[in-house]
């Protein structure tokens, strides 16, 4: 825990590529060998922090949709993307490890894999509210939508250091436009209270 807290503090001041195991050890007042005892390398340490971000993403997805405000399927997309933008802008670990530029390929792979899982969860949320048609397989369109939005967020983070309202809006427009290729403008609402 002390090691993780040290990395969070370092991430507030530096990019991921500028942090070494030595820096982490110095920040938490431990011997470098102690840090290596817990994590074999810096990428492994970052990966463990990213796992915490993924847990947060899962919780966020469960909490961000206000059923009283869901009148059209695009409301779900807006609520999900708005929640993720707020999370990214307040979490340096997520911003720097997911949106930032670094050479840790394993982290990018883990993020893509998690988006595939999230895509299925997002689809279940949509189906909870609307009778949407069968979707193409094997790629989940909601996972693609999440990845597309992340690309815009990444551009914003790299240029401005955070996700600007303007680029958050662009990500929303892009993800919504993509989803409209598969989800009709008018979908029958599902009465899940009586189901």
Language-model region placement:
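Amphipathic alpha-helical segments used for helix-helix packing
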Residues: 87-106, 151-157
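Alpha-helical DNA-contacting segments of helix-turn-helix folds
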Residues: 11, 46-53, 98, 114, ...
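Hydrophobic alpha-helical connector segments
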Residues: 62-89
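Amphipathic alpha-helical packing segments from all-alpha helical-bundle domains
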Residues: 78, 82, 86-87, 106-131, ...
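Short hydrophobic clusters on alpha-helical segments that form packing/core surfaces
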Residues: 3-11, 53, 57, 84, ...
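Helix-turn-helix
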Residues: 2, 6, 10-44, 48
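Hydrophobic/aromatic-rich alpha-helical bundle segments in the mid-to-C-terminal region
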Residues: 96, 128-175, 185-195
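Short, basic, alpha-helical segments at the C-terminal edge of helix-turn-helix-like DNA-binding modules
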Residues: 21, 51-61
